[in-house]
Amino acid sequence: MFTDKINLALKIAAKVHQGQNRKGTDIPYISHPVAVGMIISQYTNDETTIVAGILHDILEDVNPGIYSEADMRRDFGDEITDIVKDVSEPKTAGQPKLLWKERKKSYLKRLGSSYYIETYFVVAADKIHNLTDILKDYDQFSNEIWHRFNASKWDILQYHRAVFNLIRKEPVPIELKRHLAALIEKLGDIVAINP
């Protein structure tokens, strides 16, 4: 599916993520939001959900002086912006960044209270892509990949399990849930082998 709104989301995401790379790599960051949108499109052709997937990291990772929540509301409306907010870690201007566990706890709380079913599609696709990359990189670099993160591999596994426990209760396609569950299980196998 390709629409004017999806095209606009791709253009804005490419512009605002310019110069950013995937964690611990030289891969341009735009590959992630595009992949999330593509994963979502395997399970639904809902334009709102696909656009939210493409935009999902902007409010969390982009300086509001470059592209703000108000810009997103203007360009994409309240529903898409609210979905993106629901999948974003909270930012507090002028405050130091919270520790990894505190950020994830806050994220899970926000996610658990989301009004939009689309939120869970976006989160599942985001985690599917992140875990796919982690597992592929693990195959190539082994335990070296864990140095990229501000958390232990055990904490990363537990976090993904907690996210899945929220998603599995929601009316999203069983195939999407199974895809995510299989990746979490593979991560669990790695953590069990190399504690």
List PLM regions with ranges.
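Active-site helical microenvironments for divalent-metal-assisted chemistry
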Residues: 1-195
